[in-house]
Amino acid sequence: PALAQDSVATTAATAPSAAAATAPAEPFQQTIAIACRFTWECVENEPCTETEFTPDITGNAGGASADALTVQSQMVSDAETVDMTGTKQVKALSLTGGGFDARHLLSIAADGASRYTVHYADGPIVISYLGTCK
């Protein structure tokens, strides 16, 4: 028991400060700057209609491997700005964000084909957009 107490005291006395305990920067860093153009809007089970929805995605990605990065970003449109997080694998990207009232999901394939959906709790209702992001 005395040894355990000494160990705890030593650990507490030598614990690094909060500033010193921050994680080192990831070896692979990347700036995210993507322009999307969605040309179809689908509301619930109604027929899809043509649209012109052009949000921009900006942010940063980092990770231990260039092939799998964690992403923190914002999607900015005329309607709103949504904080989104997710992963980037090679050229494909998957992001989620929003709050309980409106959950957002953006999927971008390696070739740029993209789907963006918003799920609203009130209703509930879902709106989907089809287009490209590059």
Predicted regions mapped to residue ranges:
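Short, solvent-exposed loop/hinge segments that bridge or flank secondary-structure elements
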Residues: 25-67, 106
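Short, exposed beta-strand-loop hairpins at the edges of beta-sheets
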Residues: 105-109, 115-128
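Short hydrophobic/aromatic-rich beta-strand segments that constitute the beta-sheet cores
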Residues: 38, 66-67, 71, 114-118
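Edge beta-strand at a domain terminus
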Residues: 51-54, 121-134
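Beta-strand secondary-structure signal
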Residues: 33-37, 117, 130
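Glycine-rich, low-complexity intrinsically disordered segments
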Residues: 7-9, 49, 130
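Amphipathic/hydrophobic helical signal segments and adjacent flexible N-terminal regions
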Residues: 2-33, 41-44
